[in-house]
Amino acid sequence: VHLTDQEIKYINAIWSKVDYKQVGGEALARLLIVYPWTQRYFSTFGNLASADAISHNSKVIAHGEKVLRSIGEALKHLDNLKGYAKLSQYHSEKLHVDPANFVRFGGVVVIVLAHHFHEEFTPEVQAAFEKAFGGVADAVGKGYH
């Protein structure tokens, strides 16, 4: 993914303020609530029976934080996302995750970021994040044949 210097500035300005646990937990919870079929990948997470249960599930929050930290690392290396090959292979061969869910998750993260950063999250900032997350989703989806 090629980002302009301005797009990188937009992303860094927001990302430097992100609370991984809060934003990651909210994003994964939102994914599981809005796209309930994604819950099948998290059968070991316990109670996912309602929006409230999902939003307060410690495993959802912890995994959301983990995923967001991984995205944070990817944002530092958008020019070379080949390091995500093993993660891609794991999601493809072991977990059988539909690669469209990576795109969905990126979209959900954008929504949560917009909620948290209101005025700062301009259309230009959103466009930069959409572009970057698209590259990350593509890299993680590369392990699919």
From Swiss-Prot:
Heme b binds at H63, H91. GO terms for cellular component: blood microparticle; haptoglobin-hemoglobin complex; hemoglobin complex. One of its GO terms (biological process) is hydrogen peroxide catabolic process. Pfam families: Globin. One of its GO terms (molecular function) is peroxidase activity. Red blood cells. Keywords: Heme, Iron, Metal-binding, Oxygen transport, Transport. It comes from Telmatobius peruvianus. InterPro entries: Globin, Globin-like_sf, Globin/Proto, Hemoglobin_b, Hemoglobin_oxygen_transport. It comes from the Eukaryota. CDD domains: Hb-beta-like. Belongs to the globin family. Residues 2-145 form the Globin domain. This is Hemoglobin subunit beta-2.
